[in-house]
Amino acid sequence: MAGVEEAASCGSHLNGDLDPDEREEGAASTAEEAAKKKKRKKKKSKGAATGQQEPDKEAGASVDEVTRQLERQALEEKEKDDDDEDGDGDGDGATGKKKKKKKKKRGPKVQTDPPSVPICDLYPNGVFPKGQECEYPPTQDGRTAAWRTTSEEKKALDQASEEIWNDFREAAEAHRQVRKYVMSWIKPGMTMIEICEKMEDCSRKLIKENGLNAGLAFPTGCSLNNCAAHYTPNAGDTTVLQYDDICKIDFGTHISGRIIDCAFTVTFNPKYDTLLKAVKDATNTGIKCAGIDVRLCDVGEAIQEVMESYEVEIDGKTYQVKPIRNLNGHSIGPYRIHAGKTVPIVKGGEATRMEEGEVYAIETFGSTGKGVVHDDMECSHYMKNFDVGHVPIRLPRTKHLLNVINENFGTLAFCRRWLDRLGESKYLMALKNLCDLGIVDPYPPLCDIKGSYTAQFEHTILLRPTCKEVVSRGDDY
């Protein structure tokens, strides 16, 4: 405390000894020095601030450069790999956002293995692959039909029905993919029920089953050996496919009632190869001969001539291949598998002519037996009569079954397994009642004599105004 008082008294004494002018000059010089000190401090602070800002600017510039490099790198990676849609995650937030915004469009879907992607999803533009387009055969007087392909009128008519043709093509593409899938796994030792259900499950997925708008056109036929057509297993059928069997796979798909009816024959023993070749050749001959204004009987005659030109040797015996004369091809209508006209596979049929815009199933059956089939075995195929009117029904169970048929199948064919699948039970008496009333028609298996072998090939053709399209044609047959 004493030291502070002495300094204060010394200061006051010194001030008291100065003149007033000297005091003013001292005060002015002190103020100038203080101002200079403040200026120096400000300069230092400005210099320090400037020194801090310059590194910040350099850091910002380096971040921007890194960002630009990352963006360039991301663009190069996208160009190299169009399928890569996600960012690496190493860049900053802004770069990540840009990558998300600039995602590449997804490429077209591809079919899975086993097939499960609907055909309509594989072709999102709604335009489906065409079948084999052929020029119509020349007329009897030698005139060609080449003019149809260039006629503006015929082109306009063809275009007017493009939506219809497109429905057939979608159903045909489903058929092609299903049968390709079937050939990859069908083998001896499988039960017929297993084969049919596996096929039908795949067909339902690819056709994108939707009530009466899209689905299966008729039950899967898998007729064996002497049985030529209309066999599919009922519940409880334990039949197993054998190495020496000859199996006709006949199944159909439809879009909006536009039916694809197409069949092929499966064998494992090469001894049947010539029989299959004969029937396939006969079917292709029928397709080649078919056309606008062609008589149905002329098609049948050409088919018979080709088929009977083949001989086959099976187990040491030689057979002439015979066309099954009471089985035919047929015209196809909307939701109607047999639309009224028949295409014979022997000579002497109807002289009715094929017409522009019609659709036909050209199918041939060859046999080593008598060449005639008869009803045999337990019935599995049924179809509502297309022309039946209102028929009064008394029994409630029968009424219920008819409602189920109308809602799920309409006038398309069905089988007992499909009724089981819908949860129906104890329906056999009701089904018999519907058959007795003529509302539903039964289609039992059709067989040649025991010990004979039968084969089948079939395609659906469109008689378009400009050309003939074998819409179900594939790489397989």
From Swiss-Prot:
Function per UniProt: Cotranslationally removes the N-terminal methionine from nascent proteins. The N-terminal methionine is often cleaved when the second residue in the primary sequence is small and uncharged (Met-Ala-, Cys, Gly, Pro, Ser, Thr, or Val).
Reactions it catalyzes: Release of N-terminal amino acids, preferentially methionine, from peptides and arylamides
Natural source organism: Bos taurus (Bovine)
Amino acids binding a divalent metal cation 2: 261, 330, 363, 458
Subunit structure: Binds EIF2S1 at low magnesium concentrations. Interacts strongly with the eIF-2 gamma-subunit EIF2S3.
CC cofactor: Co(2+); Zn(2+); Mn(2+); Fe(2+)
CDD domains xrefs: MetAP2 (cd01088)
Chain intervals with Basic and acidic residues compositional bias: 54-78
EC number(s) reported in the record: 3.4.11.18
Any one Gene Ontology molecular-function term assigned to this protein's record: metalloexopeptidase activity
UniProt feature coiled coil, ranges: none
Record's comment on post-translational modification: Contains approximately 12 O-linked N-acetylglucosamine (GlcNAc) residues. O-glycosylation is required for EIF2S1 binding.
Binding locations of a divalent metal cation 1: 250, 261, 458
GO cellular component: cytoplasm
Keywords: Acetylation, Aminopeptidase, Cytoplasm, Glycoprotein, Hydrolase, Metal-binding, Phosphoprotein, Protease
Biased composition regions of type Acidic residues, renumbered to the chain: 79-91
Bias (Basic residues) ranges: 36-46, 96-108
Protein name (database record): Methionine aminopeptidase 2
Family: Belongs to the peptidase M24A family. Methionine aminopeptidase eukaryotic type 2 subfamily.
Carbohydrate attachment residues: 62
